[in-house]
């Protein structure tokens, strides 16, 4: 039994980020329903680490539903350096958002977790029941524990107040409006920026690490469509993994090759094995998603990479980098 569809005012935190922009696009392209009012906010509208600003935002908007995307995020190397900052800022943001949603009587909150929060030592594929089964990878334990606490809070809000607060766990998201910063972004947007620079300067492409780790990549526009489905139809408090199938996992080397092909790069490609690989794999099961949506069609990886590369090239000046 899903949400009763009727008058809904949906507040999306982190609305200017990768996933927020994708949801905006999907809604604008026809996924929004009559009676739905979508309100996208970013850090310009309120500092969500500040309880008073967060409360004021929620009092003003009076959302019936919330998609909570706002977070302090960064790539592997920034996480290693600033674990305390990632823990504190995200704990503050999440507590402020969930409690403000509760105070204004929001009927549903869908927060965003990440597969990097799962235990470092685990069996594969990982699934929704394993989140708290052991410590996360040491490289980003601050971010991971802060995100795990959303699941703890969701269960507690349900137990104590009957709230339908839930969370989704996407795998590696990429697409337009990503952070393409080479030092600080995630692997695929970093590769796209690197290939762009190598191509424009006629130099070799150096990929950090061995290229062997494997990842499941999900296109932001596919994730946006799934987020909207979760908001309307998914009524469990337990989280749900949003991902392509295990069979669609690709190596970093294959991802680099897809970017090289999409951007028509003809230079030399080398792998710098002195750089850290991070986790070798974090294969996730999308069995739960498929039990609900057996026929959902994901955008083919190469097509999604091509669309993202085209967006980055066309919007190079404005892109986050």
From Swiss-Prot:
Annotated NADP(+) binding sites: 14-20, 147, 170-173, 186
InterPro entries with a match to the protein in the record: Epimerase_deHydtase (IPR001509), GDP_fucose/colitose_synth (IPR028614), NAD(P)-bd_dom_sf (IPR036291)
Top enzyme category: oxidoreductase
Isomerase listed as a keyword: yes
Active site: 143
The protein's annotated pathway: Nucleotide-sugar biosynthesis; GDP-L-fucose biosynthesis via de novo pathway; GDP-L-fucose from GDP-alpha-D-mannose: step 2/2
Site annotation Important for catalytic activity: residues: 114, 116
Gene Ontology BP terms: 'de novo' GDP-L-fucose biosynthetic process; positive regulation of endothelial cell migration; positive regulation of endothelial cell-matrix adhesion via fibronectin; T cell mediated cytotoxicity
UniProt binding sites for substrate: 194, 208, 215, 277
Residues with site note (Lowers pKa of active site Tyr): 147
SUPFAM superfamilies: NAD(P)-binding Rossmann-fold domains
Residue stretches in coiled coil: none
Keywords: Isomerase, Multifunctional enzyme, NADP, Oxidoreductase, Tumor antigen
EC number(s) per entry: 1.1.1.271
PANTHER family linked to this entry: GDP-L-FUCOSE SYNTHASE
Subunit structure: Homodimer.
General remark: Mutagen treatment of P815 tumor cells produces tum-variants that elicit a cytolytic T-lymphocyte response (CTL). The antigenic allele differs from the normal allele by a single mutation in position 139.
Role according to the record: Catalyzes the two-step NADP-dependent conversion of GDP-4-dehydro-6-deoxy-D-mannose to GDP-fucose, involving an epimerase and a reductase reaction.
Name the UniProt record assigns to this protein: GDP-L-fucose synthase
């Amino acid at each position: 039994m899903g949400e009763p569809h009727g008058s809904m005012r949906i507040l999306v935190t982190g609305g200017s980020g990768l996933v927020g922009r994708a949801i905006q696009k999907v809604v604008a392209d026809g996924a929004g329903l009559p009676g739905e009012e979508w309100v996208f906010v970013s850090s310009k509208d309120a500092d969500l680490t500040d309880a008073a600003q967060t409360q004021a935002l929620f009092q003003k908007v009076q959302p019936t539903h919330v998609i909570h995307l706002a977070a302090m995020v960064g790539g592997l190397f920034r996480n290693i350096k600033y674990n305390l900052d990632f823990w504190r800022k995200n704990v503050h943001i999440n507590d402020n958002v969930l409690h403000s949603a509760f105070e204004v009587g929001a009927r549903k909150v869908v927060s965003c977790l990440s597969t990097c929060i799962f235990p470092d030592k685990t069996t594969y594929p990982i699934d929704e029941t394993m989140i708290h089964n052991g410590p996360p990878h040491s490289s980003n334990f601050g971010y991971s524990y802060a995100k795990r606490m959303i699941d703890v809070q969701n269960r507690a809000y349900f137990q104590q107040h009957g709230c339908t607060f839930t969370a989704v766990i996407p795998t590696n998201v990429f697409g337009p409006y990503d952070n393409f910063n080479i030092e600080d972004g995630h692997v695929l947007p970093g590769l796209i920026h690197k290939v762009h620079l190598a191509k424009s300067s006629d130099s070799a492409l150096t990929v950090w690490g061995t290229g062997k780790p494997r990842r499941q990549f999900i296109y932001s526009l596919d994730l946006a469509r799934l987020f909207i489905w979760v908001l309307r139809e998914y009524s469990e408090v337990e989280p749900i993994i949003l991902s392509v199938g295990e069979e669609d996992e690709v190596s970093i080397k294959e991802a680099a090759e897809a970017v090289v092909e999409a951007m028509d790069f003809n230079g030399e490609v080398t792998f710098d094995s002195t750089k850290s690989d991070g986790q070798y794999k974090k294969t996730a099961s999308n069995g739960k998603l498929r039990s609900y949506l057996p026929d959902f069609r994901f955008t083919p990886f190469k097509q999604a990479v091509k669309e993202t590369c085209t967006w980055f090239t066309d919007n190079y000046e404005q892109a986050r980098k």
